[in-house]
Structure formats: C-alpha cells, structure tokens
Amino acid sequence: VLARGQRLKELQGHGLWYRGKTRTHKVEVKTISELKPNDRYQFIFLTVRENQVEEALEDISKNKSPNVVTMINTIKPYGRWEKICGKGRILPAFPGAGGCIEGGILDAQLLPRAIQPTTFGEIGGRKSSREEALAYIFRKSHIPYQIVPEMHHWQISHLGVIIPLADAYYQSRHPEKICANEKLMTLTAYRMKKNLKWIAQKGMLCPAKLYMIKDMPTGMLAGVLSRVYQSEFGNRFLYRHAMHAPEEFQRLHQEFYNYMKTHTKESNKA
C-alpha cells in the first residue's frame, strides 16, 4: 500500500484496521512511502479522487510497471491519462465497494453482484491477457466482477444514476431523513430517468438492467428510491459517501451535465 503523511504513520504503527460484521479486525500490510522507478508490480491500483488522478499518474509515469488500474469516478475519456503515464498502461475500472475511514478504521463493504460488481474493461473493448489476469485475481479474492466492452459508456451510465442520488442529499435540510420526502423522491426519480433516457439515445446505456430503471414509471421508481435511501445499504454506500465527498460530487454533477449539454448541441448541429 502506497501511503503518505498521517495515513502512512497509522498503517506502519498500527496496521490496517477494518470493521467486520461483529468486531474490528487487524491485518498487517506492507507499506511504501514512494513509488520508485525500478519498483515492479503486475498491477498498480489507483484509487484516488478524479481531481487527484493526473498528479498521481505523473508519479506513476516514472515507474515502468505495465498495468495501471484506474478505479476512479470520471466522465472523461482516457486519452489524457494515457498521455501522462504512457499509452497502453491504463486499464479503466470502478470498484464494486463503498465505505469510508473513520477514526483510522476502514468501514467498507463489497456491493452485491446484482447491484454493482467491480467493473473493468480495456479501452476500445479489445480482449487482453491482462484482463484475464485481473479477473483471476478477483476470483481468487472472492470479489464479484464484470468485464464490459466499453468502460467509458459504463462510467457515463453510472454517473447518470449516482449524481441524482447524491444531489437529493444536498438539496435536503435533513439528508438523513430524505426517504420520507415524497416530493424529493419523485424529483430524484424524474432526474434519473431523464439522464438514462438521454444516455440511451446516444447508444451508451449499460448495463442492460438500467433500461428497466429508465422505463419504470416515475412514481414506482420514487417508491423504490425511498426504500433504498432508508436501508442499511443506502446509509453505508450512499449517505456516508455523499456526506464525506460533497466537493467531489458537485464537480461530477457539473461535469456530467456540461457533457450532456455539449453533446446535445453537437447532435443538434449535425
């Protein structure tokens, strides 16, 4: 694990603590404070926020490990990232997990496969041996995963869902109780459906189960969303994340709707 500052001190001094179902566990992890040019790894997993990714890739560019798995929420294509760290090194992905670090303890959990497995795929959709190697690692680690032919489309579709979900928290005076706000649930359902319809019109909507959400009556979807927000799943994977990362979600909100606006104008010109 590459860590710096206070987090490095915590890991070196106390190990990695994580919260299980009934108790807190400790595991020893090997830590490094820098990535040296001659260090060699089969995969480098990059798990930073989008506004930190280019700086991180600048550091990685000095190292010659062949595969950089970018587990990052983004709407941008991957060309600029490849220019920074080298063409052919980026393997775009997104984790099927959620949680946060509180008091130095990791409180996180894998998402069920039916909701969102860890997702990855080669740029351009080609098959590769490193895809198979990464899939093998996930299988041996009992991490649900899926390989998709167009990761950029998947990430746009993901943002079309998650941004309205996060926006609802920020619009409420009582974000911990939004499940009871029928008007806000209806508005969130409407926004989500509108996003997915636009993405589908552009031929980018995936996975296929999102078509069911797109075509669901708004009132029915609002009821489903209310139950999701009220659930332990909603608390762990939606509420905590939104409350810990408002700036990230606000930036993604702006980038997503700017993307829609720009590509709508381009379509109208054509």
Locate the predicted segments by residue.
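Rossmann-fold dinucleotide-binding core
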Residues: 79-158
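Helix-loop-beta segment of a Rossmann-like dinucleotide-binding subdomain
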Residues: 107-122, 170-180, 232-243
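Rossmann-like NAD(P)(H) cofactor-binding subdomain of soluble oxidoreductases
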Residues: 23-107
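Active-site-proximal catalytic alpha-helix in oxidoreductases
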Residues: 152-196
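NAD(P)+-binding Rossmann beta1-loop-alpha1 motif at the extreme N-terminus of oxidoreductases
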Residues: 1-26
